[in-house]
């Protein structure tokens, strides 16, 4: 079994963060649930209103962590196109009490 490549999460955040527009672009970074959880632990992401995660390997656990993160409570746009989120993750998002500002969600049917 191949070892998982350790990613420099802080560097990825710095590269993808647009503070002027409060956007975080992490598309095509080969992120999985564990990586997203590390992103959510960073204070740099507090106040982000748009999160672009398309073409990664994020699944239900990553989405549940995102939903539970107080730092993401201002999120208005979330792009999960071409990830591994199933109906279970979408249900967790729908039941979330923290993401009341979310008005745009993009996801694909494939997982």
What are these regions (language model features)?
Residues 1-50:
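N-terminal segments that cap or nucleate solenoid repeat domains
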Residues 3-9, 29-37, 56-64, 84-91, ...:
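Short, solvent-exposed loop/turn at the beta-strand->alpha-helix junction
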Residues 16, 48-51, 61, 70, ...:
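Compositionally biased, intrinsically disordered low-complexity segments
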Residues 17-19, 43-46, 70-73, 97-100:
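Inter-repeat linker/turn residues at the boundaries of leucine-rich repeats
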Residues 22-26, 49-53, 75-80, 102-107:
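Conserved hydrophobic beta-strand positions in leucine-rich repeat
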Residues 39-42, 66-69, 93:
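Hydrophobic anchor residues at the C-terminal helix/turn of individual leucine-rich repeat
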Residues 64-88:
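Charged low-complexity stretches with an acidic bias
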